[in-house]
Each structure stands twice: as structure tokens, then as C-alpha cells.
């Protein structure tokens, strides 16, 4: 599901700048076969998607990226739901994938951050800015997420690069850092919102009290600040 042009650009930036922290904000693996819609529809093509290849590609990218934190996105969260499935085969498969992910992050000494919407347990902080996968999905998601958290924030849930100020007395800003997925995925081809999807990432500087966030929109030119 990842776009090699986007992932290669991000890896190039990471190797050039060598940041102290490198956080992947979620959906590193697709797990399409575990999608609720695919489970309900016996004719869904996603039911035949190879989870082993998907998992290997995602973990290989995270290892090459040398992440220090991996935030679970709503795609990875499918595993948490299915780990308690009454179907023993499904629950075993979900548990096996979770264990594989945990082993890979243990080898990197990286933290796995759980997915919990906008709750505190799914957020991590640098300076005055919260980082999370995100859960709001609308055209003002950057603004609304910053308002919901009452904080500056960086997230990726809606797959586009955007920055919006919150409607609050304190000057909070929401940063949407884009994605590295193929921009023309079949499962969302009927959604007009996919036309605003863009490859990108966030980077910056931080202290104990402040965080300066810079957004990079890669598509369509893929020009890096190197």
C-alpha cells in the first residue's frame, strides 16, 4: 500500500538529518484482510490480501527508518479488536501479528503507542506539542483536533498535508503531516476527499517547553530540504 517514491524520500531525509527522535504516527501496515467491511463481504478482494507480505513490508520500512516510537493507527488497531474474536483462528492470527510487531519494536528499542482516538494514552509530547495518529475525519480535522486536545498537535489520520489554527484564546495549531500511501488506492476511489491526499511528513526542533513544527509536502515535486 505504501508508495516507494514517498517512503524513499522520507528515508533519504531521515538519513541526512539524523534526528534524535523519529516517530511513525501510524498505519505502517494496512491489514486489509482484517478490515470490518472485508469480513462482512464474502466477495471483497481485501479478504485475499496477503497479511504476511503486508506485515513484512511495514516492519522493514520501520526498521530502515529506525523509529523510536510507533503509534498504532486505526489500521493496526484492527488487530486489537480481532485478538478477542470468538473465531479462534482469527484471534490466533491477530495475536501472532501483534507479537511479531512487538518483537520488531523491541529489537529497535522503540515504544509502541496504543491507538485510542484522542485520549491521553495515545498521545506523546515534545515541548508544547502533542503527537498522535488522530481520529477526526473532516475538512477541518487539523483545527478540530487542536481544539479537542487544547494543544498544538501533529497527526496523520486524514492523509493530507494541512495546517490550521484552533479557534481558542491560546494560539494552538493543528498540523496534518500527510501520508506515504499510494494516492490512488482502490478502496477509496469513490471518495472525493482522496483528491486532497498528499505525501508528506513533519520535522522540526524541540526543547523542554517548545516545539517548532515544519511540514513537508512531497507530492508532486518531491523536493527535500537538504
Language model segments and positions:
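Core catalytic region of metal-dependent phosphoesterases/phosphodiesterases
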Residues: 2-108
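A generic local structural motif
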Residues: 8-11, 56, 117-120, 138-143, ...
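Short, basic, glycine/proline-bearing loop/turn elements
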Residues: 42-47, 124-130
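C-terminal/domain-terminus segments
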Residues: 78, 82, 216-226
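Active-site-proximal loop/helix segment associated with metal-binding centers of metalloenzymes
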Residues: 86-127, 158, 179
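Conserved beta-sheet core of the metallophosphoesterase superfamily
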Residues: 128-216, 222
